[in-house]
Amino acid sequence: FVLIAISVIFTVVSLGFLIGYILINGIPNLTPKLFAWHYTTENASMLPALINTIWMTILALVIAIPFGIGAAIYMVEYAKKGNKIVEIVRITAETLTGIPSIVYGLFGMLFFVTTCKMGLSLLAGALTLSIMVLPVIMRTTEEALLAVPDSFREGSFGLGAGKLRTVFRIVLPPAIPGISSGIILAMGRIVGETAALIYTAGTVAEMPKNIFSSTRTLAVHMYSLSSEGLYMDQAYATAVVLLVIVMLINLGSTFVAKKINKY
């Protein structure tokens, strides 16, 4: 009990100190010019980076979600038990989860940016991030599907429903809270990612004209400001906005899961 109490206190104090430090140093530096439509060296606006982050998140999730959920459905509902291919996919997914983001960035730079000739672009960054979060979505969806009782499937088959109808009408609805949690986790990782995007999306602090334009997300914007050493106040202000976004994502996932569970 004592060790548990110490662990809880240490975790709460560490989190409180981190959040407090960022808020104290960042809130006083939040000024209207930081939300100017165009970035300049005078205003160091974060608005283009914020909009780029939204586009990057949407595009990466649009790519990753169908593949992640589809793969999980196949492994749980269609593949035979003990299938070696399924085991290989699971091991691969677990391995991909532990790979540092810088490695994903190097892969994205060599494959998407150079080999596929996409250049430093929104699309190259989104494709790299979709590969990065694919194991998260796939594994959480798989666990959510496995948590659905087999009696649901047996009852559906007993009433004459086919496999496809059973999966989409009977199995998926109870699994939606777990699937949503995985998507929210993926979203949080995308929003906070820096290393992979430096090598694939670039650091241009302007809104993209199209998916082949170089972009800078909020996390990369904060890194660029702090690394230059001339915009530390603006970097702290950016950290506050990024922290608020991540907290809202986490709170939103909890709220959505509770609402879905009610129905």
Q: For each predicted feature, which ranges?
A:
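N-terminal signal-anchor/first transmembrane alpha helix
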Residues: 1-20
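Periplasmic/extracellular loop-to-transmembrane helix junction in inner-membrane transport proteins
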Residues: 1-3, 21-60, 82, 224-233
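Interhelical loop and adjacent transmembrane-helix boundary motif
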Residues: 42, 197-243
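Transmembrane-helix boundary motif in ABC transporter permease subunits
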Residues: 60-93, 106, 254-258
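Transmembrane alpha-helices
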Residues: 61, 163-199
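Generic hydrophobic transmembrane alpha-helix motif, especially the helices
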Residues: 94-129
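Glycine/proline-centered hinge or cleavage motifs at structural transition points of membrane proteins
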Residues: 100, 159-160, 173
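C-terminal transmembrane helix and the adjacent membrane-cytosol boundary/short C-terminal tail
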Residues: 146, 184, 224-263
